[in-house]
């Protein structure tokens, strides 16, 4: 069985101390929509533990799990200073009003849509899609770390300001059963799309294979025979985007699980 390293495990080795959240509350949608897929953020009936709120200078942890497609209408409080927003379980969530944002986690198959966001000492952990209109850094924090899982991407409509306070790292799927064993292929994946960078360049960090094995940084874009570059990747910026080129190797398909019939 193939071993896969989670981005949560990757983050664990990088974590920094942070304040605890003021509260934890999960979206239920129990009050029902006002129209179509639009719900009121300020209706306590839509939350498991009350409307998200700050306390003692700390932001809340706001969770959307298996929420479906929802447009949450209203002004979300700032989740910075210990809080954050988590979207998982194939949810497609649009939240208005939030600005000073703590941690963000978007799981595989899920999408989070936000407007203007100022990150503050934030871990942005992406296996899914994060769409932002405006994105920057609160100068009172310690920047933001973008940690990408196998399928994560962040799309920003405008320039990323305070870009030098962002760092990029994550996981790459370096094997595929779509290729035969002994076959190698270059893959280029887009991690960040934006209109450009203000305030310096994004810090380009380290990437790891999905099984946890180390990968080496290539000195430039790789060309020619992909087999000559096994275990390497090249992370770079291009016209406001962040991309990573890496090598995928053919893998043996996992055997089908045998099932014993009670009928013999």
Over which residues does each language-model region extend?
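Bacterial N-terminal signal peptides that target proteins for export
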Residues: 1-7
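Short hydrophobic/aromatic-rich beta-strand motifs
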Residues: 2, 25, 62-63, 85, ...
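Short, threonine-centered small-residue motifs that mark membrane-proximal processing/anchoring sites
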Residues: 6, 17-22, 244-262
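Right-handed parallel beta-helix/beta-solenoid
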Residues: 20-46
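Extracellular, surface-exposed repeat/solenoid domains
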Residues: 134, 139-245
């Amino acid at each position: 069985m193939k071993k896969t390293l989670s981005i949560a495990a990757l983050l664990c080795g990088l974590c920094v101390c942070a304040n605890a959240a003021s509260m934890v509350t999960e979206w239920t949608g129990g009050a029902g929509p006002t129209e179509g897929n639009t719900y009121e953020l300020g209706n306590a009936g839509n939350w498991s533990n009350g409307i998200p709120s700050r306390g003692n200078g700390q932001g809340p942890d706001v969770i959307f799990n298996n929420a479906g497609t929802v447009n949450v209408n209203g002004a979300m409080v700032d989740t910075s200073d210990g809080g954050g927003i988590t979207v998982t379980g194939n949810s497609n969530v649009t939240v208005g009003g939030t600005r000073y944002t703590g941690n963000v986690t978007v799981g595989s198959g899920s999408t989070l849509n936000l407007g203007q966001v100022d990150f503050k000492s934030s871990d942005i952990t992406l296996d899914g899609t994060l769409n932002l209109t405006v994105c920057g850094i609160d100068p009172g924090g310690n920047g933001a770390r973008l940690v990408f899982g196998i399928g994560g991407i962040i799309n920003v409509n405008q320039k990323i300001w305070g870009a030098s306070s962002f760092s990029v790292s994550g996981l790459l799927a370096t094997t595929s059963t779509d290729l035969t064993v002994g076959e190698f292929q270059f893959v280029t994946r887009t991690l960040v799309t934006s209109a450009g960078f203000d305030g310096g360049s994004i810090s380009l960090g380290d990437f790891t294979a999905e099984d946890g094995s180390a990968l080496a940084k290539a000195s430039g874009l790789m060309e020619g025979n992909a087999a000559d570059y096994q275990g390497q990747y090249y992370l770079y910026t291009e016209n406001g985007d962040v991309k990573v080129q890496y090598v995928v190797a053919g893998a043996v398909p996992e055997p089908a699980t045998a099932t014993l019939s009670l009928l013999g």
